């Protein structure tokens, strides 16, 4: 295994849709696509674009979405507008409730909603296709990572599940996909989509909640291929590192994934208004650094994060990790300097929030997850069980998967 200090160069392909920052969830909505534009501007200011390939993603279309989502739901997303939601006809309110759109505060209807879905999901699907063609070692889409969306319901500020769609794309060429996430909430719908297959292993480090219990470990052929680390308030860098490194190290040894998807939700950072963890940007980035060190094809996605300047800081820093560059803590001049007042620094300090995860908690959870991994078949071989029926993967794609050569790593 490569060391944590691995700074070798990788072929990095970065996907960015220039219009992404124009989409607006509405007044008092915490999710702001503008954060992607600010992140991008900071990346340019640090000259990181000189170390990677910049791509405009292909916009996804309805046929892409239907590989996971229901046709009725996608047709609804195509037609709903801020004007139509005010229609008094009972069918309108029924559909809004049915598809969980404009019902709760985390699924508002806004102008050009479907185009927004096409943009952020297109970035993730394009990134997956880039890895499939072996044209990059690392592919990045910070606009992606909407891991809560169900087959026929919006959820968690997302409307289509680009993570599931990207993994389905990767399964056309790669035998085994390891999905890891380090955001604050559990990646419930990614786990749900692949809980009964051995072709995808999911590992989630998240706040303890209604889903993602440590006893939830998959079903059928996917039994033991879902790993969950439900953590308490105040999680700090040291505690996460003590859990993340041994668990991921063992997962890599046992499962031998051919490609990794890392969801880097920034709502696990200290000070996030909806998160109660206490991670620094460096501690968050250390997880990416460790995953990168294995030199396995890697997709990096965004996710949650509701303190805009800290999200931009974090994802810019992690872009630097991806390309193998170190950044000065003093921010360079950029178009959004006002967001970074008063210190204009890259890194943030943890708060004084108490870490409720005791040393014994971390040790116990680590040993439980390592014991679960001992029950996983070592590097399951093709033929695998079929990709979940929700993917509607084509027969041709499965044939391609069987015929492919081992990926370049």
From Swiss-Prot:
Top-rank EC class of the record's enzyme: hydrolase
Region (Disordered): 383-409
GO molecular function: histone deacetylase activity, hydrolytic mechanism; zinc ion binding
Annotated tissue distribution: Low expression in flowers.
Compositional bias ranges of the Polar residues kind: 384-394
One annotated Gene Ontology cellular component of this protein: nucleus
Cofactor annotation comment: Binds 1 zinc ion per subunit.
Record-linked InterPro entries: HDAC_PDAC, His_deacetylse, His_deacetylse_1, His_deacetylse_dom, His_deacetylse_dom_sf, Ureohydrolase_dom_sf
Task performed by this protein: Responsible for the deacetylation of lysine residues on the N-terminal part of the core histones (H2A, H2B, H3 and H4). Histone deacetylation gives a tag for epigenetic repression and plays an important role in transcriptional regulation, cell cycle progression and developmental events. May be involved in flowering induction. Histone deacetylases act via the formation of large multiprotein complexes.
Name of the protein in its database record: Histone deacetylase 7
Species assigned in the record: Arabidopsis thaliana (Mouse-ear cress)
Gene: HDA7
């Amino acid at each position: 295994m490569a060391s944590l200090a691995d700074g070798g160069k990788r072929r990095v392909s970065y996907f960015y849709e220039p219009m992404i920052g124009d989409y607006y969830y509405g007044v008092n909505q915490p999710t702001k696509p503008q954060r992607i534009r600010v992140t991008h501007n900071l990346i340019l200011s640090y000259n990181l674009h000189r170390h990677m390939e910049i791509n405009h993603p292909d916009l996804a279309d309805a046929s892409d979405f239907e590989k996971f989502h229901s046709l009725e739901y996608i047709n609804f997303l195509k037609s709903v507008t801020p004007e139509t939601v005010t229609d008094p006809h009972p069918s309108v309110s029924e559909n809004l409730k049915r598809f969980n759109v404009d019902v709760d505060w985390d699924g508002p209807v806004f102008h050009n909603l479907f185009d927004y879905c096409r943009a952020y999901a297109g970035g993730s699907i394009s990134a997956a296709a880039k890895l499939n063609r072996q044209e990059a070692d690392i592919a990045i889409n910070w606009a992606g990572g909407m891991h809560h969306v169900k087959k026929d319901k919006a959820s968690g500020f997302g409307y289509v599940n680009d993570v599931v769609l990207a993994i389905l794309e990767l399964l056309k060429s790669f035998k085994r996909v390891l999905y890891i996430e380090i955001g604050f909430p559990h990646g419930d719908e990614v786990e749900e989509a692949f809980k009964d297959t051995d072709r995808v292993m999911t590992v989630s480090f998240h706040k303890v909640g209604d889903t993602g219990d440590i006893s939830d470990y998959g079903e059928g052929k996917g039994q033991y291929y879902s790993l969950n680390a439900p953590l308490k308030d105040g999680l700090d860098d040291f505690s996460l590192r003590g859990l993340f490194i041994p668990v991921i190290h063992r997962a890599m040894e046992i499962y031998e994934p051919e490609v990794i998807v890392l969801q880097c939700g920034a709502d696990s950072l200290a000070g996030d208004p909806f998160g109660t963890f206490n991670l620094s940007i460096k501690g968050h980035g250390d997880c990416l650094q460790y995953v990168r060190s294995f030199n396995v094809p890697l997709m990096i996605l965004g996710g949650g994060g509701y303190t805009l300047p800290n999200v931009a800081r974090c994802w810019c820093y992690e872009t630097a990790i991806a390309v193998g560059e170190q950044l000065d803590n003093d921010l360079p001049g950029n178009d959004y300097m006002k967001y970074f007042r008063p210190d204009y620094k890259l890194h943030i300090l943890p708060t004084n929030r108490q870490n409720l995860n005791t040393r014994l908690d971390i040790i116990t959870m680590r040993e439980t997850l390592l014991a679960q991994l001992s029950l996983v078949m070592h590097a399951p071989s093709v033929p695998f069980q079929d990709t979940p029926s929700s993917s509607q993967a084509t027969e041709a794609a499965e044939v391609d998967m069987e015929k492919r050569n081992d990926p370049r790593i």
